[in-house]
Amino acid sequence: LTNSGSSANLLAFMALTSPKLGDRRIKRGDEVITVAAGFPTTVTPVIQFGAVPVFVDVTIPGYNIDVTKLEDAFSDKTKAVMVAHTLGNPFDIAAVKQFCDKHGLWLIEDNCDALGSRYFIDGEWKYTGTIGDIGTSSFYPPHHMTMGEGGALYTNNLQLKRIIESFRDWGRDCYCNSGKDDTCKRRFTQQFGELPLGYDHKYVYSHFGYNLKVTDMQAAIGCAQLQKLPAIIDARKQNWEYLREKLSVYGNKLILPEPTENSDPSWFGFVINVREDAGFTRNEIVDYLEKNGIQTRMLFAGNLIKHPCFDEMRTKKEGYRVCGDLTNTDAIMSDVFWIGVYPGMTRKMLDFMIEKIGEFCHAR
C-alpha cells in the first residue's frame, strides 16, 4: 500500500530504475512507450527521472493505446511500456504483453481507473493490473473504492516487491515489516557498500527513496471497502450499460464508448465524443449539462503535450518523442468529455442525465 495512486505510479516506475535490476534497469535517456491522452501522473515519473516518454496515438471509441503503433515506437533505447486502462476499459493487454515479451521490456499497468476489470488472456480471465510486471491502483474518493486517499501496487516478482517497498520506505534496504526486527536473521552480520561490517541493516539505504506510506486507519477503511467492492463494480456496470442503451439513439451526433474485445470492464466513467457534424461542440454541450447540475470531466489531459508543463520541452523539441501523429489524441482534446457512473446514482438520476443530453441534441 501507498498514499495515493500517483505515488503508486511513481514507485512502479522508480522500481525499474534500481541498480539491483542490472542491465534491465531504466537509465536516464532510456525510452518508455506511453500515451498523451491520459492522466499526467502515468507519465510524470518518466520525465522527472530523466527518461524519455515516447507517445503513440490511441483508438476511438476504445480510448486506449493503439497497439498497431508499438513496433514503430520501439528503438534500441526502449525499456518499458507504461499505460493506463482508460476509465475501466482494458487496453489490448494480449498485444501489449506479446510486444513486451518479444523485446524484453517491462510492462506497468496503470490500473487506477479499472479496479475489478478483467481481460481474457492465456485461456483464462485475469484481473487488469495483475498481467504486467507491476500494476497500480488509486483509492482516491471518486474511484471504485476509497481509503480517503491511498494507492496500491501489485507484482508477482519478489525482487520488484522489495525494491518497491524500499523506495516507499525512505530507500532502506531492510524489508522487515513495521514493528518487526531481524527477519533476515543477519541484521548485524552483513557488509554493505563501504559501511563497517555488521552495520545495522535497518539503517542501510540501497535507494534514494521517499516516505510514501499509508496509515493503518486508511488501510482499515480499505479493508471495509473491499467487502463492498463486488456490489460497487456491479452497480457501475449497470449504470454504464443503461446510459449506453438509452443514449444510442443519439449515435448520429455522439460517438459512444465501446469495450475492448475479450474484456469485462469495471467502468469508471462514460465517455461521450461529439461528432464533427453534430451541429454543436463539446464545449457547448458541456456548458449546458453543467448549468443543469450535471458534472462533466474532460478525458484527463486530452493531449498532455499541449499543456503548459510541456511548453519548454515542446519549444526545445527535447525530452520526449512522438511516434507518428496523434490525430485521435487531438480529437479527444477537442471533442471528448465523460460523465459519471457512480454506484450511488439512482435510476432517476440517470434518467435526468439522459433527458438533458437528449434535450440538447434535439435542439441542435
PLM features: residue spans?
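Phosphate-binding glycine-rich loop
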Residues: 1-31, 44-49, 55-56
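PLP-dependent aminotransferase class I/II
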Residues: 5-6, 68, 80-84, 93-95, ...
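Hydrophobic residues in well-ordered beta-strands that form the structural core
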Residues: 34, 55, 107-109, 137, ...
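Conserved coil-to-alpha-helix start sites within the AMP-binding
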Residues: 38-43
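Hydrophobic/aromatic ligand-binding patch that stacks against planar heteroaromatic rings
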Residues: 45-46, 99, 127, 217
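Helix C-cap/helix->beta junction micro-motif
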Residues: 49, 102-103, 292
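Short beta-strand->loop structural element characteristic of the AMP-binding/adenylate-forming
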Residues: 52-62, 297
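Active-site phosphate-binding strand-loop segment of PLP-dependent enzymes
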Residues: 61-162, 338
